Structure formats: C-alpha cells, structure tokens
Amino acid sequence: MALIGSGLLAILLVLSRTPGIQDVFPLKDFFRAALVVHVDLSVAIWFMAFAAVIWSALGRDGFAWLGWSGFALAAAGTALMTVSPFLPGADPVLNNYIPVLQQKYFYASLWICAAGFGLAVLRALLTTWPKPFLGAPLQSGAFLGAVAAFLALAAFVWSWVVVPRIEEKIYFEVLFWGGGHTLQFQHALLMVVAWLWIADHLGRPSAAPPPGRPKAGQANDAEPRSGEHPSPPPSGRGPGGGLSVSARALSAMFWIAALPLLVVPAIYFTIPAGELPHMELFAKLMIWGHPYMAPLILVGLLAVWATRRMPPHAAKSAFIASFSLFAVGGVLAYMIQGVNVVIPAHYHGSTVGVTLAFMGLAYVLLPQLGFGEVDGRMARWQPYVYGGGQLIHILGLAWSGGYGVQRKVAGAEQALTTLPQKIGMGMMGLGGLIAVIGGIMFVLVCLKLMLPRKR
C-alpha cells in the first residue's frame, strides 16, 4: 500500500518539476503536500513495513498478537496518511526525515502508524535475539535493526516530550532529528541482511527454478504455505555460496556496525534535545558512525562479484541494482555543498539501494511462502528498469544541483534559466517516470504471484 501510494504521488512530483511539463500541469500548490506524503510513505512506512517482514521471517514463534495488532494499526495509519493530502487543511512543513502536514488527519495517521510499528519492534526484540549469539548472522542483523528502531522511536517520544513548541519548521526539524538519524542505522543493517540472504539463496542449487516448478500463483506442496515461516539461509553458510565467510565473522561485523548506536542515548542523556550541540552531534554520528558498516559493505561487494556467473534471476538483478545505487548515493554524499538538489540526489541513491534490496528479498521470500517461483523477463528486468530510472533521476538532480537548482521547490520557483539546469531537471523527470514504471512492474510481478488464479 505504501509503495503504491508513494509511486502515484511520485508521478505528480516529477511532472511538477520537469521543464515544459510543469507549465502544462501547474501543480505547484499541491507539490509540497504530495512531497510530504511521498517521502513518508516511501521511506518511513515502506521501510518499517518491510523491516517487520524481516523480523517475522527471522524471528521465533510467539507473541503473534503483537504482530497482528501492529499490522492492523500500521495499515490503518498508512491508509489515512495516503489520502491526507486530498483532505482539507493540508498545510505542509518540509522538515527533514519525517515531513508533516499540519492537519489533524495526518497527525492521527502518524500516531497510529507509530503505535503499530512500536508493537512490531517490541515483538522483534523478543523473538529475534540471535541463538547462538555469534552463530546466526542474519538474526544478529535483524535484532540490531530492531534495537535501532527502538532507539529511534524512543528518541521521537523523548523529543516530543521535552522540545518546546516553536516555529513549525524548526520544531519538526528538531523533533525528528535524532530519531531520523538513528533510523538510518536500522535501514542500513537490514539492507545488508537482505543482501546476504539474497546472495545465499542465489548460491544454492535450488535458486534456479527446477523443471516442473509451480506456475505463477500455484503453490508447491513441498514449500511452506502462505502464513508459514520461510526458511532463512543456514547460519553457517557464506554469502553467495561461494565466499568462505564464517557465521561468527559475519555476526561480529553486524555488532561492530551497530556500535555507534550506543552514542544515541548518551547524546540524549547529556545534551537537551533541540540545542545546537545536540543536533551537531547527530550530524557527526552519521559521518563517524557509518564507516563502521565498511566490513559488511565489503562482504556485500564480494557477494555481488560472486553472483556474476550465476544464472539470471530477479533477486540477482535486484542485488546488483541495490548495491550500485547505494554506492552512488554514498559517493554523492561527499559532493554536497550548500542547500541544493544534490542533497535529494544523495538520499535517493541511498534509499533506493535499500528499496531494491527489499524488492530482491521479496522475490526470494514469495516462493518460500507458497506463492510460486518468481520467473519471467518482467521480473528479471524490473530491478534494472526501476534502478536505471532512479539512476537517471539521481544524476539529473546531481547535475542540476551543481548549477544551483534549489531543493523542495517546483514550477517557476525553480528558476530554471540556463540550458544545463533544464537538461538536468529534464533528466530528473525522465528518470523519475521510468522509475515509476519499474515500481509498477514490481507490484504487478508480486500481485501475479499472490492473487488466486482460476484453475
């Protein structure tokens, strides 16, 4: 639901910023409200929803009522958030991380979603604790992702309690600053979990669909039925089936990557939320904390390289595209100078890398849940269409940012006066539309497998 709603709003956002088209479709007034909900659906809701999928798949049985209650609340909140831009009083505030609409319906959707995801995080903390401690790397990554999510939710609540209500843009910037930075660790950890799971799946002989596999939408009696746990990779197996990386080493890498999370409560305990040093420390946490992910990223690179001789597979396409886009986003982070569209180019690269990893893992999990094998050219090409469109979109933004085009504006406010600016934003529009097509392809592939078919 979140991915579909985000994709539909993305079409309007792209049209409102594309030279030439922006004059035919004057959507400037709607742009900011659509941007708020697009960001929240595509990053906050979609990422948290798939995080819950990973936690459920890797967690032990028990506390099912927490999972189902969380799902119901999150689904209701997402539905309300999706329609909120079209309801009265949708006054947007374009703060970072979780932008908001100053509207009672949107506020209600945020609280409902937060309650739902809070229950999912609580269940994850109770069920994904790795056993053995250093022998189950994917469970370690999932558990540490849940720890990051818990700290982020706690940071949001803490800031909400202690930060005084001031000018709206500043208030919401401060409110979501600490928790928003913390969520980045959750997304990165779970992205690597998805990479390693995909790589292990591709390295198994069974990754290639065998003769006589079930047709799309037809369950295999040898596979778990819908509603059952999928089987995670054997904990001791190296990623990609061709790398000898021990389970203990991988688990240790996840714990090392999560070490910067210890700084989060320390910042809140020592410096009041909202003060400038508080915000500066979280900015430095990103600079000095993410390099702790380097060993895991290196394993991801080696795993991508190990897949080069494996047969075509939708999950393989997603893995390659995910790593590539995440790398582009990381490079662009070091090119940011000033407040321009290089900033969204950077975070689009990083977040699209996470999205593609989750798409690839969905292709791995669907057959294990009894929905049949993901096969066909559409499935294999979907990650490249989506990732390729996003790459064009990102490069267009980065190009335009180099010529001074500002972020979070649309229509005439962009002041596109030079040919290079127009070329860059034209690339942005073209790439965005291609990416939307890739997103639709993902939804179609999944629905083809999940919807019942007449026999």
Where in this protein do the model-derived segments appear?
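Internal metal/ion-chelating core segments
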Residues: 133-205, 243-253
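Glycine-biased, low-complexity coil/linker segments
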Residues: 209-212, 236-238
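Membrane-interfacial helix termini and the short, flexible loops that connect transmembrane helices
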Residues: 50-68, 83-100, 118-138, 165-166, ...
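Interfacial and helix-entry/exit segments of alpha-helical transmembrane bundles
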Residues: 1-4, 62-75, 134-150, 246-258, ...
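Membrane-interface helix-loop-helix modules in multi-pass inner-membrane proteins
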Residues: 11, 15-26, 31-128, 160-164, ...
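Membrane-interface segments at transmembrane helix junctions and kinks
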Residues: 29-34, 95-110, 171-179, 243-252, ...
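Membrane-embedded translocation segments of transport machinery
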Residues: 245-335
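Hydrophobic cores of alpha-helical transmembrane segments in multi-pass inner/ER membrane proteins
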Residues: 40-53, 106-126, 182-196, 289-305, ...
